[in-house]
Amino acid sequence: MATNNQTTRKEIEAVYNCIAQDFSNTRTKYNIWHSVRKFIEELPSESLVADIGCGNGKNMQLRCDELEYIGMDISDEMVTICQTRGFNVVQGDILQIPFDDEYVDACMSIAVIHHLTTRAERISAIRELIRITKPGGKLIIYVWAFEQPESSKRKFTSHDEMVPFTNKDGTTYYRYYHLYTDGELLGEVMEACPDLTIIESLTEMGNYVIVAETV
């Protein structure tokens, strides 16, 4: 029998399958967040980079001639979009990433773990990201923040919300988001692995960002 948390992840998978094409059309390499771009640009050439929750693969377009990417997404439709574009992407769950221990040189999780409903799940997901990354490897985690800049279209009234996405045909779908408070992501990361070296902990355009080095 599926637990409530498993059901929620299945719901997220189903929603992204429904919105995949229209969602993908709103995500291009030209709207990659600054911290993500900086993270990718600073990686050594020939690094093997995992993008966990890669969506349409927009981040994997950067330095794709110098880096080797492997992506994973929960949505079959997103995986198909990525594969059509020539990216090496598999379907999977962030709580059970289908990669070996210490497999990649760097790992990205961009706007993913805020879809998990409990702190325990989010910490487990962070441990999975660390597990697949080699010692001395780099890790970036990016999540939505509760407090948003005045210029943002995002406005939240609680720390757990169902956020709408409307397809071109007018159908609206809702995705669960946990909206982080200041210091919350850092706390989860340090609970997941107290020995992790934190390189940066910052706020960017209504998001919290952690960049770390694994041990």
Where are these regions (language model features)?
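Class I (Rossmann-like) S-adenosyl-L-methionine-dependent methyltransferase catalytic domain
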Residues: 1-50, 55-96, 120, 138-215
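A short glycine-rich, Lys/Arg-flanked "PGG" loop and its adjoining helix->strand segment in the class I
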Residues: 123-135
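Functionally critical, cavity-lining and gating residues within the transmembrane helices
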Residues: 105, 122
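A conserved beta-strand element that flanks and buttresses the S-adenosyl-L-methionine
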Residues: 108
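Short catalytic micro-motifs in class I SAM-dependent methyltransferases
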Residues: 111-115
